Swiss-Prot record:
Protein function: Component of the origin recognition complex (ORC) that binds origins of replication. DNA-binding is ATP-dependent, however specific DNA sequences that define origins of replication have not been identified so far. ORC is required to assemble the pre-replication complex necessary to initiate DNA replication.
Assembly behavior: ORC is composed of six subunits.
Subcellular localization(s) per the UniProt record: Nucleus
Pfam families: ORC3_N (PF07034), ORC_WH_C (PF18137)
Region (Disordered) location: 92-112, 566-701, 869-902
Taxonomic path: Eukaryota, Amoebozoa, Evosea, Eumycetozoa, Dictyostelia
Predominant place of localization: nucleus
Organism field: Dictyostelium discoideum (Social amoeba)
Positions with biased composition (Basic and acidic residues): 651-661
Keyword Ribosomal protein in record: no
Record's protein name: Origin recognition complex subunit 3
GO function term, MF aspect, one: DNA replication origin binding
Length: 1080
């Protein structure tokens, strides 16, 4: 039956009310929710221990039942391949998501905080989360011997900690052995469970990172609004003297005239529906208000902070539907963190005493103590100066102390009440609440905050004028949902994230936000479900690899922390000799396969001073020199061409790479000219080669081709490859580091492209969300327009010099690219189309690094700039001179022919010929170099980094698998009107009726017949014509019978209740369409 909950242990119905049970040890009565089958043998209270002991037979039955569930609901090797129904069932740590029906970003109840979108997911129920932890669903506690338990209790009483640790280790060993056996029963192979655990942990980490990034975004966005509302709340009530606060706390005086003049301070927050910014805003309000109040207090540096921090509660109309429930909610929410026995009844009289005991009186006592300390210090100073007149001044000082103490003015700490969904509140309940708060505002300084999502006159529609006159209103406008969506896009794409959102997933988020719900909370929910479905529906993800040793530190110029970017590659379980630690800016080669980087340190000064010719590229081994040929083109971008391998040679695995391979590598001559500078580094590091061989020798994968490893990278099959083997493979380490470099530098390219496109085209309306949509749709109009403007119109107002000045302001982009790309390690890939993208990534990283270093020439002074540019173009000039010599010879021959012909030409014709052949002034070296540089920036960075699909990048974390996106979309595509339309028109498909056809016929359902006739009419339909058509289709006769009339009226009433049609006032016997109905 609906509404009943079933026990997850024995499938019995759980009682809705708490049952009384008896603790078997202390015989005390306790409350316990139990199922109807009474499966528990005994129960312990909290004083005797929280463990619930169950029968042995029941535990064994539970394990078999959980095994059956996993076998029916899993596939492949993941262990948690979950369907839509399985996710919505709320099992295995994935909540159904009912708390998001209202669209709020943060839930209102404390009890549901664990099920919120950004709470930590619950522990997987049917298998342990780690190999060492114990899950209560596994019957491990009854494995321990009773003698061991008794011995442990005696040792605890004696206080011998060493023996307690020994017993705990013995218990862990017993539990571990039993767990391993049960894991093998559940999953077969232990590695399968291990990778399932890694997928779950990676999913939790992604959700945690998403939560933290969104919280940072809200803090940045709501700074102005937070300051306005905090200043309004902190100074909402005037200061009162210390004696007045004391008399109010002791209930010696009532409400004064000044209190009646000052109304209840009320802030109106105009927000869109279901805005998550409101909840995030009021999480930061108390601390901000506390700092402001503390600064206005006397002795502000010494007053306790908790006395100035305002208590804040949120009231929801669903929980506060009556006045009594509203008052009790306020009282319980404010006093729940204090001693409840002092305030047993939920009434405002107790609430006023609560405020006096915990805020007013402690504040007065603390101020008096601080005042006494200050007076004592002053007296000591005066006694030293004036010892003779001491007796005469004592009487005067005592009178002055009383006067000063009475003159001290204090700021009372307000109590904030947030009213959510103001339009849905009952006006009578809200009016009574405001009258009650107004009566007690001289005892408790209440501050209200209304969250309004409609128009400004909503407050006058809900509340009468007399109630509104009791409020001191201040309007505050929060940012719109479009602005919040723009900020969300910046945080997801311009900040370093552990995942990459694919084009397909982004387009779904964008179009649903713009066209469907316009709610940021729903967008975040969809994104979170994309992450969950990705890990549950697919195989082992790239994010589940242990990349803790792969760290790239890429800081912006705005960051306070300094330091170069580093990528550390340290395989697990390695000795100190085999540690691979590559830092940017050092030329140390610890591993023979590592690539040496720049000899200078990676600092901004050294980057500017270094020259392009000093760039060095070393290969991982001589083995790779045979497979790659590097050449330098005119654009100074290193391109790698794969050489044809010998037919006799095979691609060897790490185990087959012997020392004999190096004998054949000494004769290699196809090396780039830049490698001439590497020989010194190789000679210096030749002594370390033998150590590197020994350190990596025993950790190579036996009987495993490296090609097979690469094939398994997009979705790692954990039955064949273990994570430990992957982490110790040197070539995979190189590949992973290059992919991390590519992923970390992609936001820099996007930000640079946006800067160029927005400022160069002077498009103020350009947004990141729109730009990403064009990139996702592969719309190249903006890119082609920008490229044509740079190359074909160099003499326009927006000249090359203007764009170069713009790029100089974006200097930090190029410095960050250098930091990221200097740790590149060349990767040896097989000659196959499957691995061409890996070579493209390396070439692209090298090109970007070269372009970034070339950019340093544009930052030099004019004299040095011209020298460096001339040196760069010198090679091009030599080639041009050869071509010019050939052209001059051809022109000389042509001129001789023309001179012979010009003898008979007229003067006019000769002048026209001279004007045509006037040589145009050649561009300067600076323009030539700049044009080529900008062409490389636009074509290489923008074209190669942004527009290609992310699927072509191996091991990039994408959420656009067809099955996953379809499952996620099915949860958030709520097209109610379209569903009703389709079901009524094609009712035959839904009912699966064999006697009917999928078109209008008399055997169809009455609702379908009348609905199709409604769609064929215009905006209005006559009732009698509609009835006549209905009867003609069923009987073939236009005369309606009483039976047909009753059936037709039932259909019409159903359409009216669904708000598809309504009666009209002007036209009698007519109905008007309300909803947008279409034929399909």
């Amino acid at each position: 039956m609906a509404g009943e909950n079933y026990c997850s242990v024995c499938e019995g119905i759980i009682s809705t009310e708490n049952d009384l049970a008896v603790c078997y040890k202390c015989k005390e009565e306790i409350f316990h929710k139990a199922c109807g089958k009474k499966v528990f043998d005994s129960l312990r209270c909290l004083n005797c221990g929280p463990i619930e002991k169950r029968s042995l037979s029941h535990q064994i039955g539970e394990i078999s039942k959980g095994k059956a569930k996993l076998e029916t609901r899993t596939s492949r090797f993941t262990g948690i391949n979950v369907t839509k129904e399985f996710i919505e069932s709320g099992e295995y740590g994935i909540s159904k998501g009912d708390d998001d029906d209202d669209g709020d970003y943060v839930g209102g109840d404390d009890s549901s905080s664990d099920d919120e979108y950004f709470g930590n997911p619950t522990v997987l129920n049917n298998y342990p989360t780690t190999m060492n932890n114990v899950d209560l669903n596994f019957p491990t506690f009854f494995l321990l011997n009773e003698d061991m338990k008794k011995r442990k209790q005696k040792i605890k009483e004696d206080g011998n900690n060493e023996e307690i640790k020994k017993i705990e280790q013995e218990e862990k060993m017993i539990i571990q052995e039993y767990q391993n056996e049960e894991i093998l029963k559940f999953f077969g192979d232990r590695s399968c469970f291990k990778q399932t655990q890694l997928a779950y942990e990676a999913m939790v980490q992604c959700l945690k990172d998403l939560k933290e990034s969104i919280e940072r975004m809200f803090k940045v966005v709501s700074v102005k609004t937070l300051g306005d509302i905090s200043s309004f709340i902190s100074m909402s009530y005037p200061k009162k003297s210390l004696l007045d606060i004391r008399d109010i706390a002791l209930e010696l005086i009532g409400q004064s005239i000044d209190d009646s003049i000052h109304h209840i301070p009320t802030s109106i927050l105009y927000t869109s529906s279901s805005s998550p910014e409101v909840a995030q805003l009021f999480q930061s309000v108390p601390s901000n208000v506390m700092m402001r109040i503390k600064s206005h207090q006397p002795f502000s540096s010494d007053i306790s902070s908790h006395l100035c921090e305002p208590p804040t509660i949120t009231l929801n109309p669903d929980c506060c539907n009556t006045f009594k429930s509203t008052v009790s909610t306020i009282c319980h929410s404010l006093t729940k963190d204090y001693d409840v026995t002092k305030f047993p009844s939920p009434h405002f009289e107790d609430l006023s005493r609560w405020y006096s005991n915990y805020f007013s009186i402690p504040l007065i006592q603390e101020v008096i103590e601080l005042f006494k300390q200050q007076q004592q210090q002053q007296q000591q100073q005066q006694q030293q100066q004036q010892q003779q007149q001491q007796q005469q001044q004592q009487q005067q000082q005592q009178q002055q102390q009383k006067d000063k103490l009475e003159e001290i003015m204090l700021v009372r700490t307000p109590v904030i009440l947030v009213i959510e969904d103001f339009e849905t509140w009952n006006s009578e309940v809200l009016s009574d609440l405001i009258h009650l708060l107004s009566a007690y505002r001289h005892r408790i300084p209440f501050v209200l905050s209304f969250s309004i999502s409609t128009s400004a006159d909503a407050i006058h529609k809900v509340l009468p004028y007399q109630v509104v006159s009791l409020l001191n209103l201040k309007s505050l406008h929060l940012r719109s949902q479009n602005e919040m969506f723009e900020q969300l896009v910046k945080h997801l794409f311009l900040k370093s994230q552990p995942y990459i959102i694919s084009k397909k997933a982004y387009l779904y988020l964008y179009y649903n936000f713009k066209n469907s719900y316009m709610s940021l909370s729903t967008t975040i929910s969809v994104l979170r479900h994309f992450i969950i479905d990705h890990f549950l529906e697919n195989g082992l993800s790239y994010l589940t690899l242990d990349l803790s040793n792969f760290q790239i530190d890429l800081k912006d110029d705005d960051d306070d922390m300094d330091g170069c970017s580093t990528i550390k590659l340290e395989p697990e379980n390695d000795s100190t000799d085999s540690t691979v630690n590559d830092e940017v800016g050092t030329g140390d080669n610890i591993d023979n396969d590592n690539v040496s980087t720049h000899g200078e340190e990676d600092t901004p000064d050294s980057l500017v001073k270094s020259d392009i010719e000093c760039q060095t590229l070393s290969y991982s081994s001589d083995d790779e020199r045979n497979d790659y040929d590097t050449s330098t083109d005119s654009d100074n971008c290193s391109n790698f061409h794969k050489k044809k391998p010998n037919s006799n040679n095979r691609i060897k695995s790490d185990l087959e790479c012997n020392d004999n391979d190096k004998d054949n590598d000494d004769n290699d001559n196809d090396i780039n000219e830049n490698n001439n500078n590497i020989n010194n580094n190789n000679n210096n590091n030749s002594n370390n080669d033998d150590n590197d061989k020994d350190s990596f020798g025993p950790k190579r994968i036996p009987n495993q081709r490296f090609v097979t490893l690469i094939q398994k990278l997009p979705s790692l099959n954990t039955d064949e490859i273990e994570n430990s083997k992957i982490s110790t493979n040197r070539k995979l380490n190189k590949l992973q580091s290059n992919l991390i470099i590519f992923k970390e530098s992609r936001p820099i390219m996007l930000e640079l492209y946006y800067t160029i496109l927005s400022k160069f085209q002077k498009s103020k309306t350009l947004k990141y969300s729109e730009l990403l949509k064009k990139i996702s749709l592969n719309d190249r109009k903006s890119y082609e327009t920008l490229r044509k403007t740079i190359l074909t119109n160099p003499e326009s107002k927006q000249s090359i010099e203007t764009l170069l000045d713009l790029l100089k302001t974006s200097r930090h982009h190029f410095e960050r690219i250098i930091k990221a790309t200097n740790s590149l390690k060349l990767f040896q890939t097989p000659k196959s189309k499957k691995y061409q993208d890996l070579v493209k990534i390396e070439n692209l990283i090298l090109k970007c690094r070269t372009l970034s270093n070339n950019f340093k020439n544009l930052l030099l002074p004019p004299d040095e700039q011209s020298k460096s540019i001339k040196n760069e173009i010198k090679q091009q000039q030599q080639q041009q001179q050869q071509q010019q010599q050939q052209q001059q010879q051809q022109q000389h021959q042509q001129q001789q022919k023309i001179e012979n012909e010009q003898k008979n030409w007229s003067i006019k014709k000769k002048r026209e010929h001279q004007l045509r052949n006037i040589q145009k002034p050649t561009d300067s070296y600076f323009k030539i170099y700049s044009r080529e540089f900008l062409d490389d920036i636009v074509s290489v960075i923008i074209e190669d980094y942004l527009y290609p699909p992310l699927v072509s990048v191996p091991l990039s974390e994408i959420f656009d698998f067809t099955q996953t996106v379809f499952i996620t979309q099915s949860r958030f595509n709520f097209h109610t009107a379209e569903g009703i339309n389709d079901n009524l028109i094609h009712s035959v498909r839904k009912l699966k009726c064999e006697c009917c056809i999928d078109s209008l016929c008399g055997t169809m359902d009455d609702f379908s017949i009348s609905f199709i006739l409604l769609l064929r009419s215009g905006r209005y339909i006559n009732y009698f014509d509609w009835l006549t058509s209905f009867c003609s289709i069923i009987n073939g006769d236009n005369n309606p019978t009483p039976n047909l009339k009753a059936r037709f009226i039932k259909s019409v009433d159903t359409f009216v209740s669904l708000e598809l049609i309504k009666k009209t006032r002007k036209r009698k016997d007519h109905f008007e369409k309300i909803a947008f109905l279409t034929t399909s």
